[in-house]
């Protein structure tokens, strides 16, 4: 489990947790960041990634830690998981919660994963997180 930060286009920093399953190749995030800054492309990952998008006024763990439980099941199936706090919620920046902001958050998270070699992505979303996901229509998903 790795705690990460993802910056959105409007300069908001999202708090997130990335978990790579034990069966996957290790992921060296500092090395990847250096490569991306140098303009190199990240190697493709063979496993997919599932983004877990929470409901309104919840956080990346979900109510009663339900998203943590779902993430563990996805990892057991060999998938990387990324759980994040929408802007204005949990440990993410901002003090305003809008649907437009959540749409941008989804796009930033999908882009962050794609930049790190995760071409295969799925989103498991609840409530307003599902609405934002459908409206965001990220091309990686």
Where is each model-derived feature located?
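Primarily recognizes the serine-hydrolase "nucleophile elbow" in alpha/beta-hydrolase
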Residues: 108-141
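Active-site micro-motifs of SAM-dependent methyltransferase domains
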Residues: 58, 88, 130
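Glycine-rich "HGGG/HGxG" loop immediately N-terminal to the catalytic nucleophile
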Residues: 84-97
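N-terminal cap/lid segment of alpha/beta-hydrolase-fold proteins
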Residues: 1-48
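Alpha/beta-hydrolase active-site loop
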Residues: 66, 96-116
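Short, surface-exposed "cap/lid" segments of acyl-processing enzymes
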Residues: 22-32, 43-85
